[in-house]
């Protein structure tokens, strides 16, 4: 598998609204609209930064994986997303290497098809892989 580049960095927060205000006041950064990602039970906003984006993620319900993440680890860095040429090929290669994934089938993400590598394979860092829609 060959990584093309870093697509985005995910930051998990309690309040998108408050975080967007803070990032605007501190850094002059502006996000697009807040979107609801029902399949992941979160709300998100993307802030473009040249070649990559920041994805701000807010739990959409108290029973979501995102809420559990905040309770266990607090707000902050959630994941790093690497772009790959072919997500199905990347999944196949990782499975052959006995690397566990959160989903063995590509999921539909905001910018393309995605999967996540189980963090115990990557020094406890959550890594998202994405085949970007071209």
Question: For the regions a protein language model found, what residue spans apply to each?
Answer:
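Vicinal oxygen chelate
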Residues: 1-2, 45-46, 82, 91-134
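Intrinsic, low-complexity N-terminal interaction/targeting segments
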Residues: 31, 37-39, 44, 55-68, ...
């Amino acid at each position: 598998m060959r990584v093309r580049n870093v697509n985005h960095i995910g930051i998990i927060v309690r309040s998108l609204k408050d975080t967007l205000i803070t990032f605007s006041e501190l850094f002059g950064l502006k996000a697009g609209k807040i979107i609801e990602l029902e399949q992941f039970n979160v709300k998100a906003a993307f802030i473009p930064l040249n070649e990559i984006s920041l994805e701000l993620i807010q739990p959409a319900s108290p029973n979501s994986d995102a809420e559990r993440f905040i309770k266990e680890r607090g707000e902050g860095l959630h994941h790093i997303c690497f772009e790959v040429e072919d997500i199905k090929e990347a999944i196949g290669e990782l499975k052959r290497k006995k690397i566990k994934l959160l989903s063995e089938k590509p999921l539909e993400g905001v910018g393309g098809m995605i999967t996540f590598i189980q963090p115990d394979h990557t020094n406890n860092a959550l890594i998202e892989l994405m085949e970007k829609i071209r």
